[in-house]
């Protein structure tokens, strides 16, 4: 099988920044995309935008040269999840994710569904603990260990299933690199440049701190999308990362 749209797992750009394209209006999203360079970032499409605009939005972004992270966090029975991941591969997305809490059989099925795509397969990432959750939130659902411990447990399971990495808090990055290895990709939301509001994220870091901790890809939303000059803000963040030893 080959992607009908675009091959996106080529590592063609070096930027670690993934901009969260969180808009309720497609025209606004595409207007933003037209203000930034696909050489400086990738774009993340989540549940709201994909529910509203579907595969057409992904194709529009691909036509503009962007790699797309399809952030739908699939969590279902193994067969359904596998089919959903294969559908994402058909769209040619660069990255797709599932919930690690769906278990080993679900994650293994998702990984197997991508085998026919070979080098054209998207990166398959698992979500460990949402960065909006803290220890109290975990206790509310019967998990008595800390967010860091739960993230490590699920990251190990993800690694055992052969996935490419996990979505995690930057606070867990150092430990997860030690446990799962340098080639295991860490994708981190909750990244806020110095002086930005935390919003609904509870466990946050600056871009510089995230890179120093070993994060491979950092998701940044409002500090860039709500900037009066998004490309300038994006390049300022990239410049700050070159100073990280």
From Swiss-Prot:
Protein name: Orotidine 5'-phosphate decarboxylase
Entry annotated with the keyword Lyase: yes
Classification via Pfam families: OMPdecase
Gene that produces this protein: pyrF
Quaternary structure and partners: Homodimer.
Record organism: Yersinia pseudotuberculosis serotype O:3 (strain YPIII)
Gene Ontology cellular-component terms listed: cytosol
Binding positions (substrate): 22, 44, 71-80, 131, 192, 201, 221-222
GO annotation, biological process: 'de novo' pyrimidine nucleobase biosynthetic process; 'de novo' UMP biosynthetic process
EC number(s) reported in the record: 4.1.1.23
SUPFAM superfamilies noted in UniProt: Ribulose-phoshate binding barrel
Active site: 73 (proton donor)
């Amino acid at each position: 099988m080959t992607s009908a749209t675009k091959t996106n797992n080529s590592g063609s750009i070096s930027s670690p920044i993934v901009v969260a394209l969180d808009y309720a209006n497609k025209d606004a999203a595409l207007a933003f995309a037209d203000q930034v360079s696909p050489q400086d970032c990738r774009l993340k499409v989540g549940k709201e935008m994909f529910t509203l605009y579907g595969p057409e939005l992904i194709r529009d972004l691909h036509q503009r040269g962007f790699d797309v992270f399809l952030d739908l966090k699939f969590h279902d029975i193994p067969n359904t999840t596998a089919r959903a991941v294969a559908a994402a591969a058909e769209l040619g997305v660069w990255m797709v994710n599932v919930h690690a809490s769906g278990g080993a059989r679900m994650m293994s099925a998702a990984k197997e569904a991508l085998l026919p795509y070979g080098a054209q397969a998207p990166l398959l990432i698992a979500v460990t603990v949402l960065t909006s959750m803290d220890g109290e939130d975990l206790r509310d659902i019967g998990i008595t260990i800390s967010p860091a411990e739960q993230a490590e447990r699920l990251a190990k399971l993800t690694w055992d299933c052969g996935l490419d990495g996990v979505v995690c808090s930057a606070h867990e990055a150092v430990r997860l690199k030690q446990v799962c290895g340098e080639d295991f990709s860490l994708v981190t939301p909750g990244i806020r440049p110095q002086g930005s509001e935390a919003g609904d994220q509870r466990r946050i870091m600056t871009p510089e701190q995230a890179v120093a901790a070993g994060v491979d890809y950092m998701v940044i939303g409002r500090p860039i999308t709500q900037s009066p000059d998004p490309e300038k803000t994006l390049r300022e963040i990239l410049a700050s990362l070159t100073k990280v030893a």
